[in-house]
From Swiss-Prot:
<keyword id="KW-0964">Secreted</keyword>
<feature type="disulfide bond">
    <location>
        <begin position="37"/>
        <end position="51"/>
    </location>
</feature>
<keyword id="KW-0528">Neurotoxin</keyword>
<keyword id="KW-0960">Knottin</keyword>
<feature type="signal peptide">
    <location>
        <begin position="1"/>
        <end position="22"/>
    </location>
</feature>
<comment type="function">
    <text>Probable neurotoxin.</text>
</comment>
<protein>
    <recommendedName>
        <fullName>Conotoxin Cal6.28</fullName>
    </recommendedName>
</protein>
<keyword id="KW-0800">Toxin</keyword>
<dbReference type="GO" id="GO:0090729">
    <property type="term" value="F:toxin activity"/>
</dbReference>
<comment type="similarity">
    <text>Belongs to the conotoxin O1 superfamily.</text>
</comment>
<keyword id="KW-1015">Disulfide bond</keyword>
<feature type="disulfide bond">
    <location>
        <begin position="44"/>
        <end position="58"/>
    </location>
</feature>
<dbReference type="GO" id="GO:0005576">
    <property type="term" value="C:extracellular region"/>
</dbReference>
<keyword id="KW-0732">Signal</keyword>
<feature type="disulfide bond">
    <location>
        <begin position="34"/>
        <end position="45"/>
    </location>
</feature>
Length: 63
């Protein structure tokens, strides 16, 4: 009985850690959109996390 409870708690903790890690990876990928946006003729569209030419409008925000 005690072993079963320990195993259930361990599985719950590991599942929570995986969810947190996946969420963090998603946030890093989202923020990466403007990371390489540098130069004299480009700009960062923060809402869409995109780097575009200064001659173009920002794309709509990603969901």
């Amino acid at each position: 009985m005690k072993l079963t409870c320990v195993l259930i708690v361990a599985v719950l903790i590991l599942t929570a850690c995986q969810v947190i890690a996946a969420d963090e990876a998603t946030n890093r990928a989202t923020k990466r959109g403007c990371l390489m946006c540098w130069g004299s003729n480009v700009r960062c569209c923060e809402k869409a996390n995109a780097c575009v030419s200064i001659n173009y409008e920002c794309p709509k925000a990603r969901r």
